[in-house]
């Protein structure tokens, strides 16, 4: 299974829309869809400061965990979700830093871009709608 950043790199390098849709569909995962939704859906607002927090990226080949596991923690960072709104901001930011330090550094860059609402290169709303209907509002 490809890491999320590998899938999105492949999409970015593809020229044809049908190839991009095929790549997304073949590599469908909740982690991939969460990154896309969190980056592109305006109804998702993050309960974290903008920019990039100070963190120590993991060594890619030795990352202790993966985005496939850690994406489940995104609920602690979304505004309007009780798990996030009820959490102490320092604890929330500490949890976020732990998440990005534990995953592959390229996936960590995607997560940071996501909370800053920077959409992955090569993706458009119509493309995402074709691959994953209804994912992005």
Task: Give a label for each model feature.
Residues 1-137:
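N-terminal nucleic-acid-engaging modules of covalent nucleotidyltransferase systems
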């Amino acid at each position: 299974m490809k890491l999320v950043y590998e899938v999105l790199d492949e999409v970015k390098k593809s020229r044809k829309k049908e190839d991009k849709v095929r790549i997304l569909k073949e590599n469908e995962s909740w982690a991939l869809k969460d990154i896309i939704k969190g980056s592109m859906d305006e109804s998702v607002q993050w309960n974290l400061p903008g920019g990039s927090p100070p963190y120590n990226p993991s060594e890619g080949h030795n990352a202790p965990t993966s985005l496939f596991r850690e994406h489940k923690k995104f609920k602690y960072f979304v505004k309007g979700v009780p798990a996030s709104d009820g959490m102490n901001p320092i604890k929330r930011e500490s949890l976020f830093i732990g998440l990005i330090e534990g995953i592959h550094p390229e996936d960590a860059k995607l997560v940071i871009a996501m909370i800053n609402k920077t959409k992955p290169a090569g993706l458009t709303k119509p493309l995402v709608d074709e691959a994953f209907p209804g994912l992005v509002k």
